[in-house]
């Protein structure tokens, strides 16, 4: 039992790193043409908020439902996005990791 717990604990950082990489890749592919995805830089579309500032607008966790059910925007230029549960978890983990403090 102790070996299994130690193995699971050792695997968590790798899984977390994989989630961060997946979240960043999903956001870059689906959102990067308009939004700044990383910890720095300007959004390609000046009116699109940088994702590192989303936490100042609302709790990042509040995006979970919208990402899973379909992100819809109030403007016609933004397409609707819908992600599966694993992708949502990765996106939320990545967004939390880049928030400005």
Role assignments for model-derived ranges:
Residues 1-10:
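Bacterial N-terminal signal peptides
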Residues 9-26:
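Electrostatic cytochrome c docking/interface patches
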Residues 20, 28, 86, 98-99:
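Localized chelating/binding microdomains
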Residues 22-24, 38-68:
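Gly/Gly-Pro-rich "capping" loops immediately C-terminal to redox-active cysteine motifs
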Residues 23, 28-37, 91:
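The canonical Cys-X-X-Cys-His
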Residues 29, 54, 58, 73:
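Residue-level signal for short amphipathic helical patches enriched in basic/charged
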Residues 45-53, 66-98:
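Axial heme c-ligation environment in periplasmic c-type cytochrome domains
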